[in-house]
């Protein structure tokens, strides 16, 4: 089981949010966003790892953010199985709205809230506050969603500074 932790420096850490995505970059960014909002944040690489984490830590996770497009076990199946383990768990599905299969996937999981990816910091904060009933308490500035800047030289012969 691969679980990534985000340490949140807070005297009174918020509820535990588990971020599950098979892609490293969005998983890392969303996990850092959750942590910077003052919530405890953990992440797992896929549905199986998330279920193992939930079984090893019963009733500790308050909210699950799961990507719909994961192989082997999509986020909807994970959400259903996670709710079987802990009915009070709040499960939220994430996906890119441009995904041509999104409507088919969502129709099978209509009972779960949805967050479009890429996730904006403001939208995530609003959604978590509303679903958890606990205001976010940002501990740091939001992580950047911008791609890393290239350090290549410009074709005009000028250097980036």
How should each PLM-predicted stretch be described?
Residues 70:
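Receiver (REC) domain active-site loop signature in two-component systems and cognate sites
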Residues 75, 105-115:
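As written
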Residues 67:
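Active-site residues of response regulator receiver
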Residues 1-18, 28-31, 55, 59-60, ...:
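Non-catalytic signal-transmission and effector/linker regions of two-component phosphorelay proteins
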Residues 94-96:
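Hydrophobic/aromatic residues positioned on beta-strands within the core alpha/beta folds
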Residues 23-27:
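Short acidic/polar segment at the start of the alpha1 helix of CheY-like receiver
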Residues 43-52, 75:
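Helix N-cap/capping motif at the beta->alpha junctions
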